[in-house]
């Protein structure tokens, strides 16, 4: 669990995710503030259904994306690449996620956009602060962790 712990700790300090979806051969990416749930290994985001990325996602879709900082030197590069699934939350599941999201981002209380979950199935964390090109990999279904 050391790999997932290190990844989760870093993700908890960030706040913007980029994710990409595809539909019928067309790709589209979007950015949003996120809340990371370390227990579920998932991001929670708000986005309107009328957006291009939400329309392409439908109620559920495959997704890939990144979270990264903006360091000015290569030695400080840290970032996550991931793949998983995005889905729109409904009912109590949505309500609970929205409450947690609003605690992290109080301004979101004024938004009515639906809550979406990005469930991560594979994560690659690059952390050059541990040595140039240092990578850690986590896979949900196999429980595999690679350093």
Curated annotation (Swiss-Prot):
Signal peptide: none annotated. Gene3D superfamilies: Electron Transport, Fmn-binding Protein, Chain A. It comes from the Bacteria. SUPFAM superfamilies: FMN-binding split barrel. Belongs to the UPF0306 family. HAMAP family: UPF0306 (MF_00764). This is UPF0306 protein YhbP. It comes from Escherichia coli O81 (strain ED1a). The gene is yhbP.
């Amino acid at each position: 669990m050391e790999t997932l712990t290190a990844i989760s700790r870093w993700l908890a300090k960030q706040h913007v995710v980029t994710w990409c979806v595809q539909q019928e051969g067309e790709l589209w990416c979007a950015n949003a503030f996120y809340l990371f749930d370390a227990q579920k290994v998932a991001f929670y985001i708000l986005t309107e259904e009328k957006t291009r990325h939400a329309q392409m996602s439908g109620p559920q879709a495959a997704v890939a994306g990144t979270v990264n900082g903006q360091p000015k030197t290569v030695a400080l590069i840290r970032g996550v690449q991931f793949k998983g699934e995005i889905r729109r939350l409904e009912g109590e599941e949505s309500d609970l996620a929205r409450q947690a999201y609003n605690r992290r981002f109080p301004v979101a209380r004024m938004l009515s956009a639906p809550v979406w979950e990005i469930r991560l199935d594979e994560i690659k964390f690059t952390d050059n602060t541990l040595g140039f090109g240092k990578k850690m990999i986590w896979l949900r279904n196999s429980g595999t962790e690679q350093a």
